[in-house]
Curated annotation (Swiss-Prot):
GO terms for cellular component: chloroplast. InterPro entries: Adenylosuccin_syn_GTP-bd, Adenylosuccin_syn_Lys_AS, Adenylosuccinate_synth_dom1, Adenylosuccinate_synth_dom2, Adenylosuccinate_synth_dom3, Adenylosuccinate_synthetase, P-loop_NTPase. Substrate binds at residues 331-337. This is Adenylosuccinate synthetase, chloroplastic.
């Protein structure tokens, strides 16, 4: 991909003002939102789990709306212990919070119970604190099998997507073609057996002898799993609306990210759900009118796992160094992540789609050793046309020339900073430049992996 180090004019990249946040008649919903949403604004792995873990201390309920075990959230408790979560919401480390897995999630029960087991081994109380939607779709080992077979076919044509092979796409495919099984189906054994047998027959018909799935074994296994999951299962739509009416505070944890969204991402190199704001509404049954605060989480640089266009990608030793410093390996797959500069065009696009009110800028400390830092502020076509947003056409996106601004680095260790004033002037300038370019305030800045490694940026005086 061609790039040019060109300085942009402020006028060219001026961003719209952030939308105002609704205030209730009695209190500021900005300072104390009843419903707050945390979403990824890049290609995933932005550090959403850490912010959710921090904010969860202030909320009664933490809910997941979409995705499955392809989402990997890494968080640390106050003692520095590491927790890698895939299905259980990150709020589980707050003993006062109830965690909800909504109807939009595709749920692999063996994986869920393994995650619960690991949490209990570390002393985390889960029973009575985790609720699962009766409308959530089930993800079976057959979906994982199909995922691997599909990727193998695509690899033969050189068109593999680079999925996590966790069965997410096939599970959502079953949902869309209306032959999927939901959690509520677990409790009618005859119906469950018939539906799963039919689903397995479809897989065998499609892939023939390559499809190695023990349907009878899974039917027997799920008889036991049905009883294990029963205490967790509720009508989460009714539960959440009752909580809303009673004044409880709800934190919604997005999985994956907007640039992987099925509709708005770099299709077909995307996930199979909607990690944007629309997926929150359909994945939980809470209307958009109830959202008081929408936080967009973005790394101070960018990463991506798997194939697909990536305009600001960095190659060579610099990418290797940043990957090593940032520990950029997938929580779910362990694959090395691709590394890139901050992409303002993509970030502004994601903020527009989601109605983002605040930004959490993460992993600023990873850039500590750089003399200069580049920020992608514009896309230019081969014909010299400046693009206002992320183009839908992949050929166009793959061949854009990125317009960069170059900012000075700070070359200092910022991991001990806990206040805005403790950050070097160049680090402050970098954060402020990003804020100015997207027109949305940066509220939190991550300066390390620990729970407390977070700087709150003071609000700018109102004009």
């Amino acid at each position: 991909m061609a790039t040019s180090l060109m300085k942009s004019s402020l006028a060219l990249h001026a961003a719209p003002r952030p939308r105002s946040v609704r205030l209730s008649a009695t209190s500021s919903r900005v300072d104390s939102p009843q419903v707050s949403v945390v979403l990824g604004t890049q290609w995933g792995d932005e550090g959403k789990g850490k912010l959710v873990d921090n904010l969860a201390q202030q909320f009664d309920i933490v809910a997941r709306a979409q995705g499955g075990a392809n989402a990997g959230h890494t968080i640390y408790d106050e003692t520095g212990r590491k927790f890698a979560l895939h299905l259980v919401p990150s709020g589980i480390l707050n003993p006062k919070a109830t965690c909800v897995i909504g109807n939009g999630v595709v749920l692999h029960l063996p994986g869920l119970f393994e995650e619960i087991r690991r949490l209990k081994e570390k002393g985390v109380q889960v029973d009575g604190r985790l609720l699962v939607s009766d409308r959530a779709h089930l993800l079976f080992d057959l979906h994982k099998e199909i995922d691997g077979l599909r990727e193998a076919e695509l690899a033969g044509d050189g068109k593999q997507i680079g999925t996590t092979k966790r069965g997410i796409g096939p599970a959502y495919s079953s949902k869309a073609t209306r032959n999927g099984l939901r959690v509520c189906d677990l409790f009618d054994r005859a119906t469950f057996k018939t539906k799963l047998t039919n689903l397995a027959a479809d897989g065998a018909k499609r892939f023939g002898e390559k499809f190695a799935y023990d349907v009878e074994g899974d039917i027997a296994a799920y008889e036991k799993l049905a009883e294990e999951i029963r205490p967790f299962v509720v009508d989460t739509v009714e539960y959440l609306h009752e909580a809303l009416q009673s004044g409880k505070r709800i934190l919604i944890e997005g999985a994956n990210a907007t640039m992987l969204d099925l509709d708005f991402g770099t299709y077909p190199y995307v996930t199979s759900s909607n990690p944007s704001i629309g997926g929150i509404a359909t994945g939980l049954g809470l209307p958009p009118s109830s959202y008081d605060d929408i936080v967009g989480v973005a790394k101070a640089y960018t990463t991506r796992v798997g194939a697909g266009p990536y305009p600001t990608e960095i190659h060579g030793k610099l990418a290797e160094d940043l990957r090593a410093v940032g520990h950029e390996y997938g929580t779910t797959t362990g694959r090395p992540r691709r590394i890139g500069w901050m992409d303002i065009v993509a970030l502004r696009y994601a903020c527009k789609i989601n109605g983002v009110t605040h930004i959490n800028l993460t992993k600023l400390d990873v850039l500590d050793n750089l003399e200069e830092i580049q920020v992608g502020v514009g896309y230019k076509t081969k014909e010299g046309k400046m693009l206002k947003s992320v183009p839908a056409d992949l050929h166009t996106l793959e061949n854009v020339e990125v317009v960069y601004e170059t900012l000075p680095g700070w070359q200092a260790d910022i991991s001990a900073a806990r206040q805005w004033a403790q950050l070097p002037a160049a680090a402050q300038a970098y954060v402020q430049r990003i804020e100015d370019l997207i027109g949305i305030p940066v509220k939190w800045i991550g300066v390390g992996p620990g729970r407390d490694a977070l700087v709150v940026k003071p609000e700018a005086p109102k004009k």
